[in-house]
Amino acid sequence: MAASTSGYSGVLFRLRKYANKSQSLCHIGNSNFIIRTTWTTGCKHQHQLNTQIESLPQMVGVVGLEIHAQIHSKSKLFSGSHVSFSDPPNSLVSHFDASLPGTLPVLNRRCVEAAVLTGLALNCTINKKSLFDRKHYFYADMPAGYQITQQRLPIAVNGTLSYSHFEGRKRNHVVTKSVKIKQIQLEQDSGKSLHDDERSQTLIDLNRAGVGLMELVMEPEMCCGEEAGAAVRELQLILQALGTCQANMAEGQLRVDANVSVHHPGEPLGVRTEVKNINSVRHLAKAIDYEIQRQMEVLQSGGTVLNETRAFDSKSGITIPMRDKEGLQDYRFMPEPNLPPLFVYESEASVPAGADSTQLVLIDRLSSQLPELPSVTRTRLVETYGILREHSFTLVNEDGLVDYFESVVKMTKTEPRKVIGWVMNELMGNLNLQNLKVSQSPVSPCALAEMINLVRSGHISSSTAKKVFQEMWKTPEKTVEQIVKEQDLWMINDKEELRQICQRIVDSHSEEVQIIRGGNKKVLNKLMGEIQKETKGKTNPLQVKAILEEMIF
């Protein structure tokens, strides 16, 4: 790669600060504007290399991902030890986890079923026979000196993941792409090394050692941080829908390694770097965009990109070297002698004679258990309720929000597109403000539906309903009607009372009335505003307008 770019080493280019704009490295053209500037929140990454390169020959980023998803299971992959994130250190360690001599692995069926389910959801081919291997490491948090994995013949191969991200200044243009899944393999997690800087020592916690992982390898078909982030977010939603992984990145249940390189289209891929253990989608996108731009600048200055492992520093927004990978590490893969081949079967008809099918993993049985996947849910929401596509993404992205929305719709005759406004603006606004989950909302779907029904029936106005919602949020023990009664928020629907109010306003604004009679009907809005102020928003604007026009004209 260095040789192919040496001809460009003398090219002069400027680095220009680009304030308040994010940069997308997804597409790099050969015009003056090499890096396309976007105004989206999805790729809003500012870092030390936040620059725009001009007069640069065409170059693109290439991104592949390796994702380690911790299987949601009560016990570990090869032992009966319990799985928990918050238990005291070294309290969940069996003899096998600690690699005591004479202990043997016993495969957890739940982990196999989770891998098959995930493979089916990602359109993979499930291998009826897969094999286990030993991958040798010499790390203190892996006491056996090796990891049991599936290097030769993994449980699932050749899948695809479709994902979407938004483009455009208003984030309303949905772009859908797909990436190939090379393989899904079962393997053990390692323990944790906890560094104590004050005492200059490293402590080992083996609670995580032996926990079941699915390693998903995505082909290098993405081109920027936004695409990679969208793919990982979609995978998170799929795993959570399946129940095969809780996918909480903050707790290490989903860890991502990004393989990043740059090259000129039509030429071989460049030397790649691996950015390890990224623990959030936002950091993933930032790390990839930084690394792509860093490599471009290295090549443009006549340097060579090293094949190395790097870490992302979230505080400074840069990647830093960890260890050199130029010398290919020999993991000394070998077949796992203590585990036979793993067989799964298509259906009961393919089960060997005399075998108990209830004790076997059947693909068609698991296929029948597949839930509605996020992409299908989004399509259904748009087609069934007529909501905007971007709203369907928000509903699906928030755990429990689809059920909340559909419950409200069922309990009210109001158009779903009006219901979505209350859910997106009032409900989500308050949840985000207080950093709460949907399940923690003090306003239940039933209460919100009751309030929306009062608006629809004309008993309270939309502006009043917003005040009522805030009271419902503060005092969830009160019903909607209690709040409306206590604060006297019922709409004034009595025509005689409305006429009296309108007459008072007309009498006290004689100058405005003359202007209106002179042909300037816009001033009528001022009188309507005065009435709304006097009644605290408890009048119907259409009714008020009709009465005022009758009185004035």
Swiss-Prot record:
What EC number(s) has UniProt assigned to this enzyme? Answer: 6.3.5.-
Listed under catalytic activity are:
L-glutamyl-tRNA(Gln) + L-glutamine + ATP + H2O = L-glutaminyl-tRNA(Gln) + L-glutamate + ADP + phosphate + H(+)
Primary enzyme class: ligase
What the entry lists under InterPro entries is as follows: Asn/Gln-tRNA_amidoTrfase_suB/E (IPR017959), Asn/Gln-tRNA_Trfase_suB/E_cat (IPR006075), Asn/Gln_amidotransferase (IPR018027), Asn/Gln_tRNA_amidoTrase-B-like (IPR003789), GatB (IPR004413), GatB_Yqey_C_2 (IPR023168), Gln_synth/guanido_kin_cat_dom (IPR014746)
The stretch annotated as transit peptide is 1-18
> Known Pfam families for this protein?
GatB_N (PF02934), GatB_Yqey (PF02637)
Q: Where in the cell is it found?
A: Mitochondrion
Entry GO MF terms: ATP binding; glutaminyl-tRNA synthase (glutamine-hydrolyzing) activity
- Please list which residues make up the signal peptide: none
Query: According to its UniProt record, where is this protein mainly located?
Result: mitochondrion
What processes does the entry annotate via GO biological process terms?
A: glutaminyl-tRNAGln biosynthesis via transamidation; mitochondrial translation
Keywords assigned by UniProt?
ATP-binding, Ligase, Mitochondrion, Nucleotide-binding, Protein biosynthesis, Transit peptide
Gene Ontology CC, one term? glutamyl-tRNA(Gln) amidotransferase complex
Its function? Allows the formation of correctly charged Gln-tRNA(Gln) through the transamidation of misacylated Glu-tRNA(Gln) in the mitochondria. The reaction takes place in the presence of glutamine and ATP through an activated gamma-phospho-Glu-tRNA(Gln).
What family is it from? Belongs to the GatB/GatE family. GatB subfamily.
The record's note on quaternary structure and interaction partners says: Subunit of the heterotrimeric GatCAB amidotransferase (AdT) complex, composed of A (qrsl1), B (gatb) and C (gatc) subunits.
PANTHER family documented for this protein: GLUTAMYL-TRNA GLN AMIDOTRANSFERASE SUBUNIT B MITOCHONDRIAL AND PROKARYOTIC PET112-RELATED (PTHR11659), GLUTAMYL-TRNA(GLN) AMIDOTRANSFERASE SUBUNIT B, MITOCHONDRIAL (PTHR11659:SF0)
Mind telling me what this protein is named? Glutamyl-tRNA(Gln) amidotransferase subunit B, mitochondrial
* Organism annotation: Danio rerio
